[in-house]
């Protein structure tokens, strides 16, 4: 009896192990980035995280349409990418469309120009944005509007201009690079946090509304990333902040974040927080123990004077 049982268990165990190995292989194949030949639009592509995403998506074989305000800098990115090869991966020379995302009156014409390039868009990645540093008491409402125009109304206008073509094809992927501050708010970031919260809400609604149409929506929320975001941030009077925050200087490498974005896009992730333990804990704390979270933020505000600690 025992011998017969042993004989039966052996093949069963081997079969189980084989099945597990097969499942692992299938999972790896599914996780492998596959953006080859897809038409990918990237806003804010002339610098920072947008530029790194341009490099990463180009290396993966995407047909890029790079967008930004500065044609010269966009062309520099195109020339840089045009001189690179990536083994057997077929790559394409990116094209560019120059416009100011904060000027929503030109976004529709820019979207039409984008669609002319390849006839359609597979993936729209909204990265362009502006940060803010300031005390609410000293911040003019015009500055609040400026941040909202760039970070919220601009991406929304571009999304709504591109969206009908995706609906007609029954295929498309809208991606927005939000922030941990779209989940929680910290002192002296009011305009920025408000714009990112608005973005989170809008694209959550959009995801539900287009789900039955074959479209995908991803909200990706990094923590601090080592770019010039804080240097270029606006202050309460509209002037540039001009300082590299300590938290920004020690933030994540934009190359690594860009690779994570590629992976999330290929896997069609719906909502991803790309941050360390501290910010992630704060997000959960805000939901599960708000009273403590509010005390922590009040304490942080008292230790600051409108500038990064």
Curated annotation (Swiss-Prot):
It is found in: Endoplasmic reticulum membrane. PROSITE patterns: ADH_SHORT. InterPro entries: NAD(P)-bd_dom_sf, Sc_DH/Rdtase_CS, SDR_fam. GO terms for cellular component: endoplasmic reticulum membrane; membrane. CDD domains: 11beta-HSD1_like_SDR_c. Its EC number is 1.1.-.-. Substrate binds at residue 179. Keywords: Endoplasmic reticulum, Membrane, NAD, NADP, Oxidoreductase, Signal-anchor, Transmembrane, Transmembrane helix. Signal peptide: none annotated. It is a single-pass type II membrane protein. Residues 1-5 are cytoplasmic. It holds the Pfam family adh_short. One of its GO terms (molecular function) is oxidoreductase activity. The chain crosses the membrane at residues 6-26. NAD(+) binds at residues 47, 49, 192, 196, 227. Residues 27-271 are lumenal. Putative oxidoreductase. Belongs to the short-chain dehydrogenases/reductases (SDR) family. This is Dehydrogenase/reductase SDR family member 7B.
